[in-house]
């Protein structure tokens, strides 16, 4: 049923009151002035229905007279009149665009369903009560207030000192590293220790080649990488072994003679304790770590080995394991000043590990007979009280190993040549 606006219902009631039924009973039909009056209406009247009354709209209602007392001419005229009013009302509804406002369109979009969404609306609208908003606002305010009064002071009280200590620790390690490489840079020009560049490259690459050999043998795959790197390294194998033997003897000699106070620092001065605990030093030459470091404008290449202290106090749980139960007390470095690597590698340059291996091989090939100054540095692993010792002399061990040269003739024969 169509509901008419309030103003339209009032005007319809006034019209029906102005048209008396006396003139209709005389058979004259409508008043001659009725069409003019209807044309004068600004808005049309909705069509009448067969029910005796139109339902109420906003508290207003009106009622037509019974049509049984109206003549047939009047009924036909009334029917035409109501039909024209109905068409006019339809045009009015289209013009006014009832139930098609912007709010209605938004509501349709939010409530429309789609088969692609499981026959559910695209957007689900939640209604939040004002009580919930007030409660959430109060909770957030309470949390911020509690954080400000309790949590933040607690964080500053406990975690801020830890942050300061961590920053101090990082700076202290950086300072120790700078002091270490500063002493190395000072000692390199006046050292008496020498090493050929191919021997140094062999020290750097041999552990990598050895690991590749072990992996390829376990997996049953061709070790092309190791073969490619091992072409020139085989020639330096005996020289590398000779240098590692010298390194072991030289480190033990520095402890025996207490050079630079190294024995007193690591073992103390109690000879009775050495005998009682059966102190024994062991340098792990089978495992090393190759490193590149930049200090100021200089680049250092180094190979690092671990020095262990064995004693009765540190008995191994499993005797089959070589280094179990031994205490790692220091790192032994073999360091050279390396000019083969460009400085751009340390400034965010586009260099990879493959470039590192390539540079090592190219420098070995182009400088096969080049001799470089080197030093042996022993650095304790105690971070807070770290101390280092730099060895720059050959010692008795160097004099012994410097009396002969070792060269490999083929895969089976090795040649030892005494120097004059």
Curated annotation (Swiss-Prot):
Record's keyword terms, sorted? Membrane, Mitochondrion, Transmembrane, Transmembrane helix
Instruction: Give the principal location in a single coarse category.
Output: mitochondrion
Q: Where in the cell is it found?
A: Mitochondrion; Mitochondrion membrane
- Membrane topology listed for this record: Multi-pass membrane protein
Q: What Gene Ontology cellular component terms go with this record?
A: endoplasmic reticulum; mitochondrial inner membrane; mitochondrion
The role this protein plays is: Component of MIOREX complexes, large expressome-like assemblies of ribosomes with factors involved in all the steps of post-transcriptional gene expression.
Name assigned to this protein: MIOREX complex component 9
The organism is Saccharomyces cerevisiae (strain ATCC 204508 / S288c)
For this protein's source organism, the top of the classification is: Eukaryota, Fungi, Dikarya, Ascomycota, Saccharomycotina
């Amino acid at each position: 049923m169509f509901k008419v606006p309030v103003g339209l219902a009032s005007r319809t009631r006034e019209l029906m009151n102005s048209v008396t039924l006396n003139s209709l009973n005389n058979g004259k039909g409508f008043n001659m002035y009725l069409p003019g009056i209807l044309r004068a209406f600004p808005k049309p009247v909705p069509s009448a229905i067969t029910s005796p009354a139109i339902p109420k709209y906003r508290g207003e209602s009106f009622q037509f007279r019974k049509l049984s007392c109206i003549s047939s001419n009047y009924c036909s005229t009334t029917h035409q009149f109501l039909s024209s009013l109905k068409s006019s009302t339809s045009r009015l509804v289209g013009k006014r665009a009832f139930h098609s406002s912007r709010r209605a369109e938004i509501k349709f979009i939010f409530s429309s369903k789609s088969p692609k969404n499981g026959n559910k609306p695209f957007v689900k609208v939640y209604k939040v009560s004002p009580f919930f908003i007030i409660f959430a606002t109060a909770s957030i305010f309470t949390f911020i207030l509690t954080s400000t009064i309790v949590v933040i002071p607690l964080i500053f009280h406990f975690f801020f000192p830890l942050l300061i200590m961590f920053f101090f620790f990082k700076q202290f390690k950086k300072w120790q590293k700078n002091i270490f490489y500063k002493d190395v840079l000072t000692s390199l020009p006046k050292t008496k220790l020498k090493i050929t560049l191919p021997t140094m490259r062999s020290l750097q690459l041999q552990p990598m080649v050895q690991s590749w050999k072990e992996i390829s043998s376990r997996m049953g795959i061709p070790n092309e990488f190791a073969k490619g790197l091992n072409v020139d390294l085989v020639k330096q194998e005996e020289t590398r072994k000779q240098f590692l033997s010298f390194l072991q003897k030289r480190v033990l000699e520095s402890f025996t003679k207490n050079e630079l106070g190294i024995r007193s620092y690591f073992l103390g001065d109690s000879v009775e304790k050495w005998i009682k605990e059966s102190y024994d030093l062991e340098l792990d030459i089978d495992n090393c770590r190759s490193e590149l470091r930049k200090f100021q404008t200089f680049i250092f290449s180094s190979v690092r080995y671990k020095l262990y202290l064995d004693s009765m106090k540190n008995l191994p749980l499993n005797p089959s394991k070589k280094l179990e139960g031994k205490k790692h007390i220091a790192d032994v470095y073999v360091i050279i000043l390396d000019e083969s690597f460009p400085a751009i590698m340390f400034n965010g340059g586009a260099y990879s590990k493959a470039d590192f291996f390539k540079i090592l091989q190219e420098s070995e090939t182009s400088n096969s007979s080049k001799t470089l100054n080197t030093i042996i540095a022993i650095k304790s692993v105690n971070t807070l009280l770290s101390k280092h010792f730099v060895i720059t002399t050959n010692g008795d061990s160097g004099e012994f190993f410097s009396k002969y040269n070792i060269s490999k003739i083929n895969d089976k024969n090795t040649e030892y040549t005494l120097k004059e």
